[in-house]
Amino acid sequence: SPLRLALRRIELLKLPIYPNAWPKNPAREVSSVLLNELFYVGITAMRNWTGEIEIGRGRIDFGHASRGKLDHVMEIEIGGSSRLDSDILKLCMIKREIPTVTLSLVAPSRAIKKRCHTGKCAEEVSVRLRELEPVLDNVRDIIVVEFDVPTKGISGYTNHLINGKNRFKNDKQLFTRGATKREIRKFIEKNRKSFFI
């Protein structure tokens, strides 16, 4: 299925860290902007997957088309939590318009949330979906996918990290703040082998 293929790709992403770049939040070491762009480069590299698709008056993060017909829609929830409800509503409306489409929503694990100072973790997204079930049709059709990497001490820990502070010392702004999405995307594409297992 399209989702299964996307999940395999997501499992190959390396978490781009830059330790001690946020003095006011020592637990944080990941830019949510960089992580979002990493998802974009990884998923859109797959066959039949497209990013930033305009549907009606809204835009979805990713869509998979088979024989020219949209059959899977994916939203990535890494960043502010304020857009979660609107993304859920968007997915439900797409399901109403295209009953055969499948839906997924990717959110970080609780551990990743702490590291990138993002809005909602996958567990919290699942709770919100249950809260909205009585008032929104098609909410039950949304598959929640948790994005996670091994923690310290677990096998594969270092393989799933890319330390920008060590590997790209002159590109701190790309790992922290001050760079545009286009600049970050171009940087990831140029250094693709460093960001994927």
Please place each PLM-identified region on the residue numbering.
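A structural signal for short, well-ordered beta-strand segments and their strand-loop junctions
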Residues: G51, S104-V106, I143-E146
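Active-site beta-strand-loop-beta-strand hairpin of nuclease catalytic cores
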Residues: I60-V73, E97-I98
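Catalytic cores of nucleic-acid endonucleases
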Residues: I78-L136
